[in-house]
Amino acid sequence: MTTQNFLVEIGTEELPPKALKTLATSFADNVEAELNQAGLSFDKIEWFAAPRRLAVKVLNLATQQPSKEIEKRGPAVSAAFDAEGKPTKAAEGWARGCGITVEQAERIATDKGEWLVHRTKIKGQPTKNLLNDIVANALAKLPIPKPMRWADKTVQFIRPVHTVTMLLGDELIEGEILGVASARTIRGHRFLGEKEFDIQHADQYPQLLRDKGSVVADFNERKAEILAKSQAKATALGGVADIEESLLEEVTSLVEYPNVLAAKFEERFLAVPAEALVYTMKGDQKYFPIYDKDGRLLPHFIFVSNINPEDPTAIIEGNEKVVRPRLTDAEFFFKTDLKQKLVDRLPRLETVLFQQQLGTLKDKTDRIEQLAGEIAKQIGADEAKAKRAGLLSKCDLMTNMVFEFTDTQGVMGMHYARHDGEDEEVAVALNEQYMPRFAGDELPKSLVASAVALADKFDTLTGIFGIGQAPKGSADPFALRRAALGALRIIVEKNLPLDLNDIISKAFDLYKELDNERLRNAPIAKTRGGFSEYPEGYVSFFTRGDDLVPKQKILDEVVDFMLGRFRAWYQDEGIAVDVIQAVLARRPTRPADFDARVRAVSHFRTLDSAEALAAANKRVSNILAKAGAAIGEINLTACVEPAEKALAEAVLALRTEVQPLIAQGDYTAVLDKLANLRAPVDSFFDNVMVNAEDPALRQNRLAILNTLQGLFLQVADISVLQ
């Protein structure tokens, strides 16, 4: 079998930097899928991505598609011929569809009888005849949310396409992709190297592009070069570069030929909180800040240029000139904000709506203050500090700095609180209330901050669910999934003794206590019928349409939603789905307790006796489900068979033995002990007839199984384990 390397490059206008890597890897994955579907063998696929190009190189691609045989089975021989041996209409119709006569059909013997069959051999095509469609299909399946048209073309793509090059070895694959004919011409860097040049062989890519066009097409090569040179520049300046992975990849996507340079700004700007300076350096300018060994920001930054002049002075000064006004703004906002205390900004929160049915940010602040205090009492935090932090939690949203640099919310509250003389725990809590901000982010360090963070998240979850705005599909405008998972992480990883039902119930009660006439819209007043009190069971003003919603209904919805977040969390940790389902079946509402059960069941699943006991529990569940009547306690004197007496004694002994462990939440120890039941359980089912004719005997045996099941259900429903 002969092979050749295959290259396809799509030359475009500047591609969205945050989407570049995803587009490139998806393109490679799609090409691979199309090649596999076509039955074409290859050794490896490489992908390339630069601001104005996507490329895929297939190594050692077979130049000929293999032939294949298609088998089309017809009716059974018994149904293909009548009693006289003549073909039936069914057989003739099938044969006609195959383009043959019944007599030309072959026969195949199976364990279900003999069948008519027609085999057709399809000769494989030369690979070069297939590649145009393969590439077109791969591009059509790219994740492009908003494709665009350009010029007078009817085709659509993420950006206008200017060149297409497809080479199988040295042979140009002729065809048209996205309205552009395939050609050998590829484009180089906008400002460096040759603007256009021809490529003769797929093997020349990407080196030819670098040599002639001054473009480093390999995304990972550019990324590694930027990282290494940035770290070296920072070291030379006596510091360490702050290089986040997401920003590094974005910068890599912005340049074709990276030139890493260092610049500086005036030291007077260091009087402004570093977070504000870093926000504008990273977010607006795509610069890498530099810190000293003690974590203090240095008056230097690193940037990556797309050109490489002999004297970079003009480029460096230009970047310093660009960033200076932004830093000056931050300095001005900071000095202006310091003139007014955070607490004095509380009245302004009345002017900002949190949500139309849920009131203003001041209403939310009042609820957070009270809920944070309640949570603080339960987790052993300082209640007064938690309430103070809750009261001030949203005040920094009214500052000039946060209005201009939105991502500094929380951290600027911390700096302003310190300036105002607030307690350090209160100040830190203003920053940590938003933690964790994303998957894998750190958690609040103090219990006071944890109380405020939880109060904020539970207030949002309760309110938004209360008005019927739960996430649907991928839409989650209030980030409720993130809030739920963040709350669960705080409770579980800090092992806090909190119950979801209890916290959500308190959050509901606060909505009721703090509501007022301007929150009660016309539909609610109409539904209440003019009564001064809500109907029984309707303890909040939440409505959906014109209907008041019972508290318990929404409590259940929020709890179920939060417990559902556990599934994704544990699956990311590699825990089996059936383990999670086993615990979810018991619906424990204390997250730390839920976690302990998952860890215990995950451990139990590794034991030798787990599979047999899971199957036995499934059998027990089926038996008890059919029992119908109420089942009493075990009567040892009523046991007849040795096997049933042995199991009865074992479960009664273990029921007493595991109770202290259950109380301690040591579920791993509980299941370790219950694992010893395998032998008596197996013996019971091997030697005892549960549905005995004697009603008393039958009821006692059901009681044994009911007690057995109850022991396991104190931890999880292990009958769902696979």
UniProtKB/Swiss-Prot annotation:
Its EC number is 6.1.1.14. One of its GO terms (cellular component) is cytosol. It is found in: Cytoplasm. One of its GO terms (biological process) is glycyl-tRNA aminoacylation. It catalyses: tRNA(Gly) + glycine + ATP = glycyl-tRNA(Gly) + AMP + diphosphate. The keyword ATP-binding applies. Pfam families: DALR_1 (PF05746), tRNA_synt_2f (PF02092). InterPro entries: DALR_anticod-bd, Gly-tRNA-synth_bsu, Gly-tRNA-synth_heterodimer. Its main location: cytoplasm. GO terms for molecular function: arginine-tRNA ligase activity; ATP binding; glycine-tRNA ligase activity. SMART domains: DALR_1. It comes from the Bacteria. Keywords: Aminoacyl-tRNA synthetase, ATP-binding, Cytoplasm, Ligase, Nucleotide-binding, Protein biosynthesis. SUPFAM superfamilies: HD-domain/PDEase-like. Belongs to the class-II aminoacyl-tRNA synthetase family. NCBIfam families: glyS. Tetramer of two alpha and two beta subunits. This is Glycine--tRNA ligase beta subunit. It comes from Haemophilus influenzae (strain 86-028NP). The gene is glyS.
